[in-house]
């Protein structure tokens, strides 16, 4: 399979995440409680968007829809729906104001200056832009502890009944009050597209409904309960497609998330990533 340069970057990121190179605080999931029409569902999510590194030194890493799905499958987890994205924002202890780079007049990324138009035209998907936006977020998070449930700072890669084959669905960058700048899960982008503003929030497949253990993948397919986490009922497609996932894994043991694989710092990973990408001429 020919991946192309940003696909090669995705491959490296997926391998790093699956081997356990992500912060310890990301392994402590945050509960989301939904109580409607006499039913109470409690599901659990990673406290922040997927990142690589350790608790002191990490970088959030946007990837494509299929790559996000590969990571979710490896950990026995799911991607959220737009309603779940809203619920996570509502439950978040830390709600950040969106700071899209595309709204900034002048940017210095990777040691070079860019106007807004130049950035929009050529830098949205660059590794340097991922790191720059990560630094913007870290400045917003000063005074907060890693592991607190945080939301508002990225667009979620989501599952939606509006999702068309080969396309990407995104939802998020919530404003104060909970209204998303990017609503509805509909995207003009192909499934393999990714840029600095996207994030991957993983949802544990294990949940409780009215005190009973359930699987979120089953809830999303249940006509009686899907409304709890999806605005338009039963979710027709509970996974992005990628080579080899005709039967997506949703039952991987919880220990898959609690791996003891040593983490490397953000700086070390970015250096290795940039060294790798320089060989294929992409920043």
List each language-model region with its residue ranges.
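Short acidic-hydrophobic catalytic motif
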Residues: 1-56, 60, 171-177, 191-207, ...
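Conserved hydrophobic ligand-interaction patch in extracellular adhesion modules
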Residues: 65-143, 202
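Acidic, proline-/serine-/threonine-rich low-complexity intrinsically disordered repeat tracts
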Residues: 254-263
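Solvent-exposed loop/turn segments at secondary-structure junctions
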Residues: 50-51, 85-87, 164, 207-209
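Long, low-complexity, intrinsically disordered segments
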Residues: 262-283
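Cell-wall glycan-active module
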Residues: 32, 37, 256, 268, ...
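C-terminal, surface-exposed recognition/capping segments
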Residues: 110-253
């Amino acid at each position: 399979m020919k991946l192309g340069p940003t696909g090669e970057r995705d491959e490296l990121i997926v391998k790093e995440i699956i081997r356990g190179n992500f912060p310890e605080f990301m392994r402590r999931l945050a509960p989301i409680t939904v109580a409607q029409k006499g039913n109470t569902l409690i599901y659990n999510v990673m406290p922040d968007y997927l990142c690589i590194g350790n608790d002191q030194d990490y970088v959030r890493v946007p990837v494509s829809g299929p790559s996000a799905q590969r990571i979710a499958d490896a950990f026995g987890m799911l991607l959220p729906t737009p309603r779940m994205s809203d619920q996570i924002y509502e439950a978040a202890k830390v709600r950040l104001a969106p700071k899209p780079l595309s709204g900034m007049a002048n940017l210095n990324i990777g040691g070079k200056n860019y106007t807004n138009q130049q950035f929009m035209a050529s830098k949205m998907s660059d590794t340097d832009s991922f790191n720059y936006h990560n630094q913007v977020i870290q400045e917003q998070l000063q005074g907060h502890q890693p592991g607190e449930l945080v939301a508002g700072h990225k667009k979620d890669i989501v599952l939606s009944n509006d999702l068309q084959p080969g396309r990407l669905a995104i939802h998020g960058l919530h404003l104060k009050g909970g209204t998303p700048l990017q609503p509805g899960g509909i995207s003009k982008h192909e499934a393999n597209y990714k840029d600095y503003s996207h994030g991957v929030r993983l949802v544990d497949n294990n949940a409780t409904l009215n005190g009973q253990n359930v699987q979120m993948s089953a809830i999303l397919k249940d006509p009686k309960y899907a409304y709890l986490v999806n605005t338009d009922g039963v979710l027709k497609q509970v996974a992005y497609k990628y080579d080899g996932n005709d039967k997506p894994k949703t039952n991987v043991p919880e220990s898959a998330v609690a791996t003891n694989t040593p983490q490397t710092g953000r700086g070390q990973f970015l250096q290795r990533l940039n060294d790798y990408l320089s060989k294929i001429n992409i920043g």
